[in-house]
Amino acid sequence: MSAIRIIHDYPYSPLTVWRAVTDPALIPLWTATGAGGRADGFRAAAGAKFQFVAKPKPGWRGVVDCEVLEVNEPSLLRYSWTGDEGGDVTEVVYRLESHAGGTRFVFEHTGFTGIGGFFMARLLGHVRRRMLSVGLPAVLADLDDGGGLRL
């Protein structure tokens, strides 16, 4: 089984990082570095079903079906991820903890199986690393002290 695990430290409070990764208006700004999908129907509440909706590409319909499985604000978000009809159901986990005056963010995406899962994990791993090293820091830098976007 293949998996993605990425750890980043950000110089912002866990509440600020939590807001950036759970506010439906902010999510498309950092996922896939601004070209990511909007999180239709997302709520940080266990049982909430939502979809990441992006521009379709050859071989992909542009929709990921998800369900929030566990929430412990502001330290844990866990949700299922199904990228294709009939495809494997994988799991995404965000863990946030105070660290060195900021936040340590751990991203995990697990449950990829077979050779197709191996290649999907490699592809998504590359995209996620860019999102968390470029996209999310840019959004965090644009938030004011109250968590709103600076205009």
Where are each of the predicted segments found?
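A short small-residue
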Residues: 1-3, 108-115
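Hydrophobic ligand-binding cavity/cleft-lining segments
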Residues: 1-38
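Hydrophobic/basic alpha-helical segments enriched in Actinobacteria
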Residues: 5-6, 15, 23, 40, ...
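Hydrophobic-ligand binding "helix-grip"
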Residues: 28, 41, 51, 55-101, ...
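A conserved amphipathic terminal alpha-helix motif
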Residues: 111-151
